[in-house]
């Protein structure tokens, strides 16, 4: 019985905000929790929500309440406050491969060629869809706990750097970096 309840709530739920805003939110995970008191148990709900504008901004939030809709609302508000910007190559994929970690959760994100689609499981797919990413390959290498997977994915996305920033750190021109990249890509084919 408890296993069935959990699997029903694991599916991503996509919604446009009621205010007609530019954000899309997806319910990643909902968990029923219990507080043991003198008279028995008091049940509540914890929700994990991902919010994004499909243009490179994304955030996640965690909300807890006695009722499911209130927990989702709190999580959505928290996600909107904690949004990050991720630079995308051609507005569709990552600039470079990156790994993220949180606790026992470890994820590997790889850029993909056009037409590949989002190859990711569970909570990572919700993040990429709300982010506006169209082509990416992602693999969860550690914990499958949705909270750790989301935080590990955000850790990886925060490590994503635009080539202009990389060129500035190395002290070379952006055009030189791009020329090297074209040369390497040409060698692989």
Curated annotation (Swiss-Prot):
Answer whether the UniProt record assigns the keyword Ribosomal protein to this protein: yes
Which Pfam family, giving just one, matches this sequence? Ribosomal_S5_C
Can you quote a single GO CC term? Answer: small ribosomal subunit
Q: Which Gene3D superfamilies match?
A: 3.30.160.20, 3.30.230.10
One GO-annotated biological process of the protein = translation
List the PROSITE patterns hit by this protein, alphabetically.
RIBOSOMAL_S5 (PS00585), S5_DSRBD (PS50881)
Q: Does the keyword Protease apply?
A: no
Coiled-coil annotation: which residues?
A: none
Q: Which InterPro entries match?
A: Ribosomal_Su5_D2-typ_SF (IPR020568), Ribosomal_uS5 (IPR000851), Ribosomal_uS5_bac-type (IPR005712), Ribosomal_uS5_C (IPR005324), Ribosomal_uS5_N (IPR013810), Ribosomal_uS5_N_CS (IPR018192), Ribsml_uS5_D2-typ_fold_subgr (IPR014721)
Q: Which GO terms describe its molecular function?
A: rRNA binding; structural constituent of ribosome
Q: Which residues cross the membrane?
A: none
Q: Where is the S5 DRBM domain?
A: 23-86
Keywords associated with the record? Ribonucleoprotein, Ribosomal protein, RNA-binding, rRNA-binding
| Role of this protein | With S4 and S12 plays an important role in translational accuracy.
Q: Domain description from the entry?
A: The N-terminal domain interacts with the head of the 30S subunit; the C-terminal domain interacts with the body and contacts protein S4. The interaction surface between S4 and S5 is involved in control of translational fidelity.
PANTHER family per record: MITOCHONDRIAL RIBOSOMAL PROTEIN S5
Oligomer and partners: Part of the 30S ribosomal subunit. Contacts proteins S4 and S8.
Spell out the family assignment given in the record's similarity comment.
Belongs to the universal ribosomal protein uS5 family.
Q: Which HAMAP family match?
A: Ribosomal_uS5_B (MF_01307_B)
Query: What is the name attached to this protein's record?
Result: Small ribosomal subunit protein uS5
Q: What is the lineage of its organism?
A: Bacteria, Pseudomonadati, Pseudomonadota, Alphaproteobacteria, Hyphomicrobiales
Gene from which this protein is expressed:
rpsE
